[in-house]
């Protein structure tokens, strides 16, 4: 989905990065909220490493988890600012940028940062 230019510009990010982010954040969520249900012995080197972090640094993991979401909120708000600066005025496109950036962070925001509207190209 994407319009090349204009007020309604939106481009979906890379499926590869969205998959990596979803799996990673899902695992992080699992480690923070349900660490007792993780089959550590079945995860190769990742298992003992995760178990060590959960056993010794669970507070840091939890705080880092909420910090990551807070950063995503900030990135999403910045995406709205960038939309306005780049002439993306369509409300639906702005909402899509906000949601995509909230869920996938810099993987989405980098696409918006790289976008140059016709208005910007002439300057």
UniProtKB/Swiss-Prot annotation:
Record's bilayer topology term: Multi-pass membrane protein
Protein's UniProt keywords contain Transmembrane helix: yes
Membrane-spanning segments: 15-35, 63-83, 95-115
Record has Transmembrane helix as a keyword: yes
Compartmental location: Membrane
UniProt-listed Pfam families: TMEM254
InterPro entries assigned: TMEM254 (IPR028110)
Keywords attached to this entry: Membrane, Transmembrane, Transmembrane helix
GO cellular component terms attached to this protein's record: membrane
Lineage: superkingdom: Eukaryota
PANTHER family: TRANSMEMBRANE PROTEIN 254 (PTHR34104:SF3)
Protein name in UniProt: Transmembrane protein 254
């Amino acid at each position: 989905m994407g319009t090349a230019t204009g007020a309604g510009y939106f481009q979906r990010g890379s499926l590869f990065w969205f998959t990596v982010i979803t799996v990673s954040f899902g695992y992080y969520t699992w480690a923070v909220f349900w660490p007792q249900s993780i089959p550590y012995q079945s995860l190769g080197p990742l298992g003992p490493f995760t178990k060590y972090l959960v056993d010794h640094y669970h507070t840091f993991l939890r705080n880092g988890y909420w910090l990551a979401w807070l950063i995503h909120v900030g990135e999403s708000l910045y995406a709205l600012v960038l939309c306005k600066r780049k002439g993306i005025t369509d409300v639906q496109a702005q909402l899509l940028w906000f949601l995509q950036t909230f869920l996938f962070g810099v993987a989405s925001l980098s696409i918006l940062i790289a976008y140059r509207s016709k208005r910007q190209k002439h300057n």
